[in-house]
Amino acid sequence: MGSYTDKNGKVWTFSVKYELVLFLKDKIKIDLLEPYENGNNTLEEVVRNRYRMLELLFNTVKFCNRDVSDAEIWESFDDGAVVNAQEAFFSDWVNFSQKSGRPDVAAAILKAQELIQAGIRAAEAEIKTVDSSQVIAKITQAVHENISAPIPSFGNSQDG
């Protein structure tokens, strides 16, 4: 079972089971049983496309918490809770895959999680190399140059 806690301290739970798997395949065309087989690219899609990941998480939480409004679910993802929900979902998906006799799918999911974390670390490292004072100086210079540039004229002002 997966769970995450929202900013108000509410614990949201869900569980990847066959009923949910069939629902997601029918509702949003995401195949958790065969996420990379027969031309299916579910695993890559949810790892690379943030909107598909949100769609997957929303529909998972909604399916497992049917008495809750859509707005409450979307609000529950605020303040970083979506990252926790994503990690909980992947963990539960791995457990489901292992118990369903699909260790290959579980291994692929774990590898995808590693790639996500590596991408985050690379982005954080790149951000740390940015010298914000240089960026601000370049922007200030560009603004100053554009303000002091002559205003182009359109047409001939002597024709009148």
Predicted regions and their residues:
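Charged interaction scaffolds used for protein-protein
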Residues: 1-10, 30-44, 48, 63, ...
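Short, isolated positions in well-ordered beta-strands
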Residues: 12-14
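A short, sequence-level motif marking secondary-structure junctions
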Residues: 16-21
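Short active-site loop/helix that positions an aromatic residue
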Residues: 23-26
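Elongated alpha-helical scaffolds
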Residues: 48-59
